[in-house]
């Protein structure tokens, strides 16, 4: 049995899609365990770029099973569109499996997401407005509609009617807007359910059988540890658990079956949306990193906020996710910057803090303590091993590994999968 979990160690957008795609080559099953179509990943396959939001990136390999786990929230309309997009490009989806226990995002979730964000005004979270939060709210309130319900015409009709009664009262009395009629949603979404029915099963059985048979299973996290609802910068977080522990709940696989946890980080830090960001840059260097690194959201197109690498953040991610391997991406983006900085700790009211604080009030007053390192000017995009890196680039990479306490297993010097280099196998 060999299982690997891929998690983001920062605020998402660390390049997990590319690393998952790279590791998928040696995996037999690839599964997502949380989130929904709020997560976007770009995959380059046969020289062509694909953008996926729901379906695991292993779908491009005909011999691999791809799983949408029970911990995900699925927008059936978005899923059917993504399936069509893949079919139009000649990509088979026969090996897709969708959990019958995953929850469904419906039009009222999308509407609520947008209205609630507007209502918050200056206190908005920076949601992608994909209905993720409201769908997880219904799940926690035990009124959610699951995939298994969507496939049963009578059950779906009854649950939808009950939910619309409550949601329409909310729309009309609280937000002062028109609600939905049953017929606005029912037939369209029931039909989406029928279109995906052939993929639906108990995915926990699929995954556990694969592990028991000794197959290599790769679990693909979305977002990042700092967006985890428990361990992230709450409330500026997602509504699920991207941490590695989320696999046990969101995929139905016991904790004893997780062997390796790969933490993916950029050689700098980015964040989309609102919330604290201690090492954020508001200068020419920040603008340069954003442009060279093409730091714009896959899902939203929004420019990402950019900052120096923060080892306090990644150490926190290591601890709460049990990270065993570091995958460091986008090292090439820093080429040409004369002096690089790594945050090693925070200073709060004269005191040095080495662990990430829970209080956003404290965090807002924290000043990053930086270690400066010399940059490099050499082109590193063709580098294939640590030994080939210029001395300063290698020192920078190794210093990040030292400061975070995570052994380096993979490093990347460009967006293409051929620019991804293995230092040690994560399947060992």
Curated annotation (Swiss-Prot):
Q: What's any GO biological process attached to this entry?
A: IMP metabolic process
Write down the Gene3D superfamilies for this protein, in alphabetical order: Adenylosuccinate Synthetase, subunit A, domain 1 (3.40.440.10), Adenylosuccinate Synthetase, subunit A, domain 2 (1.10.300.10), Adenylosuccinate Synthetase, subunit A, domain 3 (3.90.170.10)
- Which SUPFAM superfamilies does the record cross-reference, listed alphabetically? P-loop containing nucleoside triphosphate hydrolases (SSF52540)
Q: Which InterPro entries match?
A: Adenylosuccin_syn_GTP-bd, Adenylosuccin_syn_Lys_AS, Adenylosuccinate_synth_dom1, Adenylosuccinate_synth_dom2, Adenylosuccinate_synth_dom3, Adenylosuccinate_synthetase, P-loop_NTPase
Q: Which residues bind substrate?
A: 298-304
Which residues constitute the catalytic centre? 13 (proton acceptor), 41 (proton donor)
Could you say which cofactors this protein requires? Mg(2+)
Give this protein's Gene Ontology molecular function annotations: adenylosuccinate synthase activity; GTP binding; magnesium ion binding
Write the protein's name.
Adenylosuccinate synthetase
SMART domains registered for this protein in UniProt: Adenylsucc_synt
The similarity annotation says: Belongs to the adenylosuccinate synthetase family.
What does the entry's cofactor note say about binding and number?
A: Binds 1 Mg(2+) ion per subunit.
What does this protein's UniProt record list under function?
Plays an important role in the de novo pathway of purine nucleotide biosynthesis. Catalyzes the first committed step in the biosynthesis of AMP from IMP.
Subunit info here reads:
Homodimer.
* Binding site residues for GTP: 12-18, 40-42, 304, 330-332, 412-414
Q: Where does Mg(2+) bind?
A: 13, 40
Q: Name one GO cellular component term.
A: cytoplasm
Q: Quote the Pfam families the UniProt record gives.
A: Adenylsucc_synt
Q: Where does IMP bind?
A: 13-16, 38-41, 128, 142, 223, 238, 302
The EC code for this enzyme is: 6.3.4.4
